Amino acid sequence: MFKQYLQVTKPGIIFGNLISVIGGFLLASKGHIDYPLFVWTLLGVSLVVASGCVFNNYIDRDIDRKMERTKNRVLVKGLISPEASLVYATLLGIAGFMLLWFGANPLACWLGVMGFVVYVGVYSLYMKRHSVYGTLIGSLSGAAPPVIGYCAVTGDFDSGAAILLAIFSLWQMPHSYAIAIFRFKDYQAANIPVLPVVKGISVAKNHITLYIVAFAVATLMLSLGGYAGYKYLVVAAAVSVWWLGMALRGYKVADDKVWARKLFVFSIVAITALSVMMSVDFMVPDSHSLLAYVR
């Protein structure tokens, strides 16, 4: 039974989000790490993300039955009752928000609430099923964890937090569209209006390319704004150029699914590399940052 309750929280998604939380937290800490705050923030975000995933599993159990990738999920197979999952999700959420409020700060908690509401209330309940823009809305909730990590330290939503929000939101788009391409038949069978299904894969490729360009610009802003150093800048530029090259090669490939899967895998490599580099190559913003000259 423990295994089922763990699976329904989507541990892989929790782990991926924690990497970005750590990146945002350490970027803001700039070498002066408050370890109790670090632990409370990680635990709080983990529980909130877990809660959102359980609610998502509850909401999506009808369409999950139609998709090859999700047909064996815990709620689809009836290993946990829908009622029990709702109680479980609620308890996880309450615990997570309380940890963020009392262990971090109210701003971190409210950011968690906003990300949660967007993911569960706006994306899962409505946009995912009814709009081609569901991915765009969902990207905002996916970008919340690193911003929470950052604001847990600063207690302020400054330009650094805004840049993180932009980076991770823009990253979500090609990442998600790549999944929709190599899982095209699943989304089609479940009648989920993702861009590749509604507008076609060729249109999705155009969007992927444009979003990666925007992502590349956003990643550079951390260094230009004086928040991250030049080692981060080099890595950010390198992964962005490589990812963009992969996207452009998509116009000539014979097998879109193979290409999309490779693009998806590299997206994880890219965001992990950026999270690591912003953790270790931070700077204290000052008047010498390039952005200071245009303020």
From Swiss-Prot:
Name of the protein in question: Protoheme IX farnesyltransferase
Its membrane topology: Multi-pass membrane protein
Regions crossing the membrane: 8-28, 35-55, 84-104, 107-127, 132-152, 162-182, 208-228, 233-253, 264-284
Pathway the protein contributes to: Porphyrin-containing compound metabolism; heme O biosynthesis; heme O from protoheme: step 1/1
NCBIfam families: cyoE_ctaB (TIGR01473), PRK04375.1-1 (NF003348)
Miscellaneous information on this protein: Carbon 2 of the heme B porphyrin ring is defined according to the Fischer nomenclature.
Membrane as UniProt keyword: yes
EC code: 2.5.1.141
Domain of life per record: Bacteria
Organism: Klebsiella pneumoniae subsp. pneumoniae (strain ATCC 700721 / MGH 78578)
Catalysis performed (reactions): heme b + (2E,6E)-farnesyl diphosphate + H2O = Fe(II)-heme o + diphosphate
PANTHER family referenced in this protein's UniProt entry, alphabetically: PROTOHEME IX FARNESYLTRANSFERASE, MITOCHONDRIAL
Compartments where found: Cell inner membrane
This protein's record includes keyword Transferase: yes
Biological process per Gene Ontology, one example term: heme O biosynthetic process
GO CC annotations on file: plasma membrane
InterPro entries reported for this sequence: Protohaem_IX_farnesylTrfase, UbiA_prenyltransferase, UbiA_prenylTrfase_CS, UbiA_sf
UniProt keyword annotations, A-Z: Cell inner membrane, Cell membrane, Heme biosynthesis, Membrane, Transferase, Transmembrane, Transmembrane helix
Function: Converts heme B (protoheme IX) to heme O by substitution of the vinyl group on carbon 2 of heme B porphyrin ring with a hydroxyethyl farnesyl side group.
